[in-house]
């Protein structure tokens, strides 16, 4: 790094690269183990070696008596995740716009969001459960569980919007106003399209955080489980590779969603990408705009703001 | 009745929190003229532009376009169009949609607005094949043409340009400034162009407005600003002048003689009302009217002669058509002479040479502006930058 | 969070309208539940029925039980160990990505590689360690096959070791992401200036990189500590029931409907977590640096 003069890399590069590789193995190794084991033969067990290769345990998931209500919990999880995604996107964008102004309770709302983020999930679930109990409302996935999950996804959404707006150049809004756009036209035709990669990032967070949420949901879910709760129940009851099959399936769904989100961000970025051999001054034109980093750094934005 | 594109600023003041950005400015920019607001960064020129455009509201005062007050009107209803610094082309729209943006906001059908956008692009001489490109895929010069046509498609009576050439390299800058001037002539509308580059302002503007610290120092034609600066500040900022200050000792036959701190004597023609004896005044002499005489002796002394400064050569810069010689004068400001290159080559100078600089009284011009201005330390201002800038020119 | 130039001078209701949905959700699903937990912690309990009254018995029982202190000590110990490990990992990985990977494309690609697991199920990622670390797991099988061990190592699974491994696996991303982000903002020129000034590689890290990435370090620390302190399922599954944490004990109480003692426990835990976060926020003014 520091010594960039020569072409050779310093020894620290190799040491750090080795560390990084080990870390990636550490991250993905166990996941690939259960991925492989989910294709265990019908007589195979919970550990290696593989006793044949089959889709038996995936089939077992759909036989309800064996491993609980997989289909029901899966569809509930998806429905809840889409609901959370929609609400997170809309509410986060609105809040992000609000925080561009100075207003009276900005600090209070900000700290409430941060507190909501670091509140132990089970405690929050307990509180939401108590609230519904006292109010005499039956907890359900679309009410209490939805609310409990929003306390987790909204702070993330807000933080991403902070990061996104901090890179947004207000001159685009002025240009739009100058060209006769009304306020909502400016928002719809200029601000939102320019921020689209960041908004897709918020959507990705909203979906996956909800789809995989467990500690906040466990108490307020009511009588019908979401998928992570079903898996949680299985960890104590089920001692067959069906558990791994479920893990593989749910991870596959996550990957599809991540891939879809990242691909769309990449496509938008590429559409706007500056030509490499462009005029050097072209770089200055929209350089303060966000396209270069907003989408790619979506993950980064989470912790960022 | 004022013509459509006439801009009148009446006692405009703008404060940002505690900072006074624009200080009681009044100015009339005639219809169909090319006006440059010129000054160092932070002098308030961009704020004025933004107030005309409606992106900023004046703290007090009135802005009139075509004789009608526009304060409080949204930008789009003022008949102005702005070309932003770095252009602010929408990164998510291609060239055609950028240009057609205003028409889209007004509900013009797609086919029609694209047709009109194409015509507009042709008018700024941007090749058709660029119309589907994204802004990031264009060079600086192409981006500027797109920005120009995006602004002009609104059929403005006033076009406001915020540092339009600063994102371009030197070659394009010269080319585009000529084109801006040509566009302005063709369209016959008012252009207001903000810049911090003296040569740019002088090259294009009918009316140059030199600003400093939120105030107008001088508003006049380029030639007048350059040859007859109103104040020591303008003389220094525009460059090309040596500023002389001193106390008036005699006034005789329309010529005042002054003595500066080192005892050197200068003469300047004065008009009525003439300054009084004992008054501190400033005058200036153009650099290309200063002659330099090389001395043999080691200790130069101007003696009792007027319009002579004695000193040693501090720097020699070859500038192509002339040679810029800077002379350190004891207990006084440096004197700069622009010598024709053949004259310089006839009697070459070296750094450290003892020289006498001399000029004729009729080449001296009395400065009327406030001598003590700028009031150092009273308001925040880039004093440092200004001084070094004026010395460089 | 700059105020818009044109709108700042006059009052506008826009921000209040815009922030209302967020504030509403937070008040209803975070504020009120939080207050309820505090209120219920003072309620009395008769077998399984909550009696709305005001008693301090939940707290006195909690604070007089030696088990409480053991649990809190254990939980804080987990939090500190995991914090230290994830901090080292987070810093090293970010440092590698930011300062050693030269191509921006590679940098982003490798960064995404680290963040993808964050978007998948924590429960799945946790249980994925079981077939690896178990008595007949892959690791033990390999060790025996290689002759490095003659019998399966028991400490690998259902132990503090496996709990910490799972925590680090789940939560190190929360450290990497913010540290990477603040490190990526360090101007290369600053580093080069330090090197030109004669700073060694080590001094560049201690004097330039660490101070300039302190926001990320603070945020990551807040995330990791809050997550470990609030965990119950990792410690339940990965310790095989042999260890416990504060929230795990609480979840047992909740399971048998002992809400008031659980709530009292929750209030104590929240106080401690808040204090820890406050200490971090005091060292680094996270908010100011975020909005700047």
Q: What residues fall within each predicted segment?
A:
Chain B
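Helix-to-loop junction immediately C-terminal to a conserved catalytic motif
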Residues: 53
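Conserved coupling/switch loops of ABC nucleotide-binding domains, chiefly the family-specific signature
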Residues: 59-62, 112, 213, 245
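Non-catalytic connector elements of ABC transporters
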Residues: 251-393
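Conserved ABC transporter NBD signature motif
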Residues: 61-69
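ABC ATPase nucleotide-binding domains
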Residues: 75-81, 85, 89-236
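The feature captures the beta-strand-to-loop junction immediately N-terminal to the Walker
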Residues: 38-40
